């Protein structure tokens, strides 16, 4: 796929342009300079043609604790991109940072560079004073306002017009899209860098280094995956700035854009209430979740240590009993392959399709062996079961009246279905519906998940 990188000094509207192009607010946008630190990837479609857009941190001559690492990230983006959008701001004018960015880009004579002048709001284009911008050495800029969508169509036309110069790159089908979530400093970015085999995101002992939810596609054993790394979620009292509040929102959005979750824990410390809260997000999302215990190389172990830690996890995360638990060290690159082995197992279970006759045999047999308890004045009777379409295994059980369902019996049936069809690593959903039209009007359908049931 064609790759286009957005490069420029801080606060020229790079992230606003990125969000405008992908039509989705992924990058954090704020007036505070330096908000974007890592490379952020997104897909753009225009006139039936697609390309990948890369947002980058701001280039500056000023000293900053992260500036050297940010510049390294920008350099990575330039190296992998086919086209560079060099963005300046008409509102702020040019300064030493613009000239610094221009000097860096001029070193890449083999790259196609589109000079973009942003933050042109209501000015008449014919009355703009552009003389100072010619001094940067990239000719006349394309005039846009990312915030107000002015000139965006022309910019997209320019990019698509150059696409044929780079040939058609065959797009490989994704095996899985997953996000990595966890509290700050558990090693999410270290894991991402191992997966991508390069320093894609900033890694530091300072919690909160990653602010955005960062998309990246990568190949493992010749198969393509998409991973979304997220900012760590802090305790509510520690969310001191609006930037970190945005980061929590990005994490929640990352989950909504994923098909699977890697919940990272720090194996070198005890589990915390914060870990439990984040685990609750996994349950609410109702997505397959792999519990990844990181920093296992730092733990003093004997032959019982792993099992004891697993018991602690099961006790804390009772609402995720189906989630597999794996132990890794991202920094030392230990047991990373177990992540992909587990993903493949989960993918296989998600694809299981069960014939209606076989499903009914299992449910009716379970129904005969263990009769439902009397609940709300009557006993539940199940007459028919079928598998419905869904992102996770979903089953509809037609019964005399869902009001007679006790949650313990729903859990019993779920476990029987899991055992019969090998659905051990994925969440499943049971819908109990009345077979009788009259009862359907008088009662509500019941949706059951592992830890309880909700009225629909």
From Swiss-Prot:
This is GTPase Der. Residues 2-167, 176-351 form the EngA-type G domain. Associates with the 50S ribosomal subunit. GTP 2 binds at residues 182-189, 229-233, 294-297. Keywords: GTP-binding, Nucleotide-binding, Repeat, Ribosome biogenesis. Residues 352-436 form the KH-like domain. GTP 1 binds at residues 8-15, 55-59, 118-121. InterPro entries: G_ENGA, GTP-bd, GTPase_Der, KH_dom-like, KH_dom-like_a/b, P-loop_NTPase, Small_GTP-bd. GO terms for biological process: ribosome biogenesis.
